[in-house]
């Protein structure tokens, strides 16, 4: 009996520009994803922004940015929603995050598995140390995603620098993904 205010789709290859309108009309006011950040040629310039749909409706959008920090290299495009809770991933996720002028916190989702696993003992052992603060590493804090997103959304609403993206969210990295239901794909595109 709980209505979700967050659409959580971390592992999807692209989104129609009609989605913000559909979400708003469904009572959803926050959207979270991660894979769209993988594009290499036309890199998404934002990780926290308002996504404006085809009818002008906008939705608060947050991209997860967890990745390993590799010393001496700039952040990579690939991010994960299956992070390990360790200093390397916390630093990598924070370094990769692009909207530090709006918000100085990042959400790192961690656990073993492909999008459905839970924390392993090593994650929790790292957390016991990282929550106390380690020099040079962002502080770790566990909380519900909904609470985090609501706080960041409020910051974004108050900040004039919060960017807006208009149109579809496209993942060029997976362009040409095949389907066994080509007719459905064609009709979906036409209906958009």
Question: Predicted regions: what is each one?
Answer:
Residues 1-192:
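Catalytic-domain carbohydrate-binding cleft regions of carbohydrate-active enzymes
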């Amino acid at each position: 009996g709980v209505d979700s205010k967050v659409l959580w789709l971390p592992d999807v290859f692209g989104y129609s520009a009609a989605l913000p309108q559909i979400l708003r009309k469904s009572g959803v006011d926050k959207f979270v994803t991660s894979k769209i950040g993988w594009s290499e040629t036309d890199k998404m310039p934002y990780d926290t922004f308002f996504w404006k749909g085809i009818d002008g409706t906008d939705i608060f959008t947050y991209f997860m940015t967890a990745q390993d920090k590799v010393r001496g290299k700039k952040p990579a495009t690939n991010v994960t929603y299956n992070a390990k809770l360790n200093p390397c991933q916390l630093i990598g996720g924070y370094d990769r995050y692009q909207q530090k002028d709006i918000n100085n916190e990042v959400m790192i989702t961690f656990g073993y598995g492909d999008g459905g696993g839970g924390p392993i003992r090593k994650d929790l052992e790292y957390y016991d140390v990282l929550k106390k603060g380690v020099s040079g590493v962002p502080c770790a804090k566990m909380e519900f995603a909904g609470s985090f997103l609501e706080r960041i959304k409020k910051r974004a609403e108050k900040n004039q620098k919060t960017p807006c993206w208009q149109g579809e969210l496209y993942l060029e990295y997976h362009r040409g993904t095949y389907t066994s239901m080509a007719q459905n794909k064609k009709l979906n595109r036409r209906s958009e």
